[in-house]
């Protein structure tokens, strides 16, 4: 009986490094995702529901325009916002940060595509993929925005001064070194930024510290 050929495949363990990268804002950060009021209005339009003529709660618009580390508040008032800013934490998203890092790889011609970076570097968020920020001051800016259709609308933007964030990064060192990863993050912070209003120069940052995470 013929003996079968046996091929041995060596599977090498992946040992990613993990670090905490602390970034600090060079310009104010604006957090302004689609709020719950706008979401409801959009859904109603698509369902051809009659337009709700009641005045929207402006505090709901402000509060729900941000991701919150411990879940968004369920009451919408100035007091609720102050309490949330003190006892909860507004957040960036791990998805948004990693996307901007990948864009920096391509725009700075480190690689032609972000495919290799996306496969070898991860941004690890808390809970639902969130990265909380620390800040010195919070402001609400009122601004007239002109939609593609219809009249200008008044929007309220959450703007943070003196902000920082700790980002947990894992990466495969034989693909990108720690120095390269930090350089990419700095390039993203300088040229792209994070949050809303990036085209106007908001959300710029740089790395101020790197701490290794020791795993067993």
Locations of regions flagged by a protein language model:
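RNA-interacting cores
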Residues: 1-216
